[in-house]
């Protein structure tokens, strides 16, 4: 009889299952209760400064954001310079002339004599003064360059990176 019992133990019958612990058979279900959830904050997140926005954009999109920002900056500065050169060369020349004369008077330097005839003096600004004015306008437009960069970079990066790579 002992041989028969050993043979029956070694035979695997279809109705016989391996023993399992009841803990592993029960599916784990977690309920979401209102007490464990994070309460919604009543205050909106703080607004980021321009520098923080640029850093965040650079972290997310890398060289794409830097390239777009530099491209917009080049266009912005060149447009500012063209506007200063065409629209305000004589006005800037007058300002430059009056500022330089004030400095010369302050330090008792020799002031160049104006034209002897009764013709009005033509004021010509130097290229460096025009560049300085264009740079001032360019710096004032930083509040427009950053949002424009933030609007252009995501679709541009998505288009050129391809559909499989997330930005």
Swiss-Prot record:
InterPro entries the record matches: FAM210A/B-like, FAM210A/B-like_dom
GO cellular component: mitochondrion
Signal peptide span: none
One of the protein's GO biological processes: protein maturation
Domain of life from the UniProt record: Eukaryota
Protein family: To A.thaliana At2g20940.
Protein name stated in the entry: Uncharacterized protein C106.07c
Organism: Schizosaccharomyces pombe (strain 972 / ATCC 24843) (Fission yeast)
């Amino acid at each position: 009889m002992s041989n028969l019992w050993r043979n029956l133990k070694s035979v695997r019958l279809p109705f016989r299952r391996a023993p399992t612990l009841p803990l592993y058979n029960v599916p784990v279900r977690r309920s979401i209760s209102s007490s464990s959830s994070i309460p919604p904050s009543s205050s909106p997140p703080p607004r980021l400064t321009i520098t923080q926005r640029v850093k965040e954009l650079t972290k997310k999109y890398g060289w794409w954001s830097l390239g777009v920002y530099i491209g917009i900056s080049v266009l912005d500065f060149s447009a500012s310079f063209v506007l200063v050169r065409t629209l305000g060369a004589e006005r800037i020349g007058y300002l430059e002339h009056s500022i330089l004369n004030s400095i010369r008077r302050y330090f008792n330097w020799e002031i160049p004599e104006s034209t002897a005839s009764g013709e009005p003096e033509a004021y010509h600004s130097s290229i460096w003064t025009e560049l300085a004015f264009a740079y001032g306008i360019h710096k004032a437009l930083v509040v427009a360059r950053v949002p424009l960069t933030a609007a252009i970079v995501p679709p541009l990066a998505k288009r050129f990176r391809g559909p499989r790579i997330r930005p």
